[in-house]
Amino acid sequence: NDLKVAEKVRGSSGIGLQRYVLAILFNQVIGEANRMLAKVHEGRYHLFRSDDKGKGNKRGLELKVHDNRCPEAQGRSVSMLSGGEKFLVSLALSIGLSTVAQRGGVQIEALFIDEGFGTLDDSSIHDAMDVLESVRRSSGMIGIISHVQLLESNIPTHLEVIKSGEGSRIRLA
C-alpha cells in the first residue's frame, strides 16, 4: 500500500514530491530575484531554471542567466558570471529567498550582507543600494559589512570599527 502511494507521489516525471515542491519554491525565489535584477544594470540579467537533464540531486535545480545584451544566446551558467555579476545575482537570490520565506510566515527581521560591494562599479553600487533601501522600507533592518567608502555616503546610520593599539572600538556615525 505504501509502495502504491510512493509511486503516485513520484508521478510520471520521476522527480519525487520533495524535488517538485522545491522546484515550485525555487521558481518563486527566482521570480523575486528577477524583480530585483530588473532594477539593476538596466534590466540586463534574467535568471531561469535550466531544463537540462542534470545529474542526481541537481536535476531541475540548475540556475542559468540570460543576458539581454545577447538576445540570441541560450543563457549561461551562473558560474560563468564575473565577480560583480555574481554578487548582484547572489544578492537578488538572497532577497528573493527572504521574500518567499516571509510570505510563508517566517519573520525575518534583519538581512546581513558581508562584503561583495568591492566587486561592483559605482553605478552598480548605487543600483544595489536603491534596491536594498526599498527592501529595508518593507522588510526591516539591513546590515552591510564593507570597506567600500562609497557605501558610507549612501547609508545614513552606520557603525565604524576603529582599530587601535589597545584593540578596536566602535563609533556610531
Regions found by a protein language model. Give the residues of each.
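Terminal ABC-like ATPase head and other globular end-domains that cap long coiled-coil arms
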Residues: 1-173
